[in-house]
Amino acid sequence: MTDMYSLFVAFVLGVVEGLTEFLPVSSTGHMIIVGELLGFTGDKAKTFEVIIQLGSILAVVVVFWRRLFGLIGIHFGKVPHEGKTNGHLTLGHILLAMIPAVGLGLAFHDVIKSLFNPQSVMYALVAGGLLLLAAEWFKPKNPKATGLDDITYRQAFAIGCFQCLALWPGFSRSGATISGGMLVGVNRYAASEFSFILAVPMMLGASGLDLYKSLHFLSWGDLPMFAVGFITAFVVALIAIKTFLSLIKRISFVPFAIYRFIVAAAVYWVFM
């Protein structure tokens, strides 16, 4: 039987997941920290996190559904061309960007799992913040790729290499990929869109594998809690994605870097 506190925990973590999954601040880091503060840890908590991540993924699918279906050859009307070249974003770009992190993730799965703790997250928050600053300070003044369809295969693979940094819990997958994109000549907005689209197969694969391994932790009694978390994460992520894409046309990533440093300091104060 799910009690009211469990539903409260589900709602809070759903908000945290939806709000942070696609911002360059690390959803995993925030989920670990908030989970520790709420006393919601262990195998059941990990299974819950997988479920609500699926809610965030669904939000990306809703926002980019035309582009996603277009990648697999299913077209619903004409998708606007984004960029100044005659190129097109293809499934090949996404697959190339997936290879580095998938390979490294499978090879070092156990090592990565051992890093899911507040101390490791604290260091990753700082490192990810420094990368955001580096992306803003050292990005090309005139990016070659001004839209999604300008991104080359080489740039896609390079972004995939940066994505490997996100295997460190607390680093931020979106932070790593967007920063990487900016450093290799993709403008901030296009890099963000590419990061969100890339998140769908990456997160579906990782979440699907984790869910398969965690099926025995699921019970019908937990269904209300999981439903609250899933729906909350979906709604909040939908709002966060649209708001973020609007904001980055006007602001840099410096505020996000500063926020990461503040959270890292808070983690040190609370957990160290």
Swiss-Prot record:
Membrane topology type:
Multi-pass membrane protein
Q: Which GO terms describe its molecular function?
A: undecaprenyl-diphosphatase activity
Q: Which reaction does it catalyse?
A: di-trans,octa-cis-undecaprenyl diphosphate + H2O = di-trans,octa-cis-undecaprenyl phosphate + phosphate + H(+)
Gene Ontology cellular component annotations, sorted alphabetically = plasma membrane
Q: Which organism is it from?
A: Yersinia enterocolitica serotype O:8 / biotype 1B (strain NCTC 13174 / 8081)
Q: Which residues form the signal peptide?
A: none
Q: Which family does it belong to?
A: Belongs to the UppP family.
Q: Main subcellular localization, coarse class?
A: membrane
PANTHER family per record: UNDECAPRENYL-DIPHOSPHATASE
The residue ranges crossing the membrane are 5-25, 45-65, 88-108, 115-135, 152-171, 189-209, 221-241, 251-271
Q: Which domain of life is it from?
A: Bacteria
What InterPro entries does the record tag this protein with? Answer: UppP (IPR003824)
Q: Which UniProt keywords apply?
A: Antibiotic resistance, Cell inner membrane, Cell membrane, Cell shape, Cell wall biogenesis/degradation, Hydrolase, Membrane, Peptidoglycan synthesis, Transmembrane, Transmembrane helix
Role noted for this protein: Catalyzes the dephosphorylation of undecaprenyl diphosphate (UPP). Confers resistance to bacitracin.
Pfam assignment, any one: BacA
The UniProt record's further free-text remark is: Bacitracin is thought to be involved in the inhibition of peptidoglycan synthesis by sequestering undecaprenyl diphosphate, thereby reducing the pool of lipid carrier available.
Q: Which GO terms describe its biological process?
A: cell wall organization; peptidoglycan biosynthetic process; regulation of cell shape; response to antibiotic
What EC numbers are recorded for this enzyme?
Answer: 3.6.1.27
Which named protein is this?
Answer: Undecaprenyl-diphosphatase
Q: Where in the cell is it found?
A: Cell inner membrane
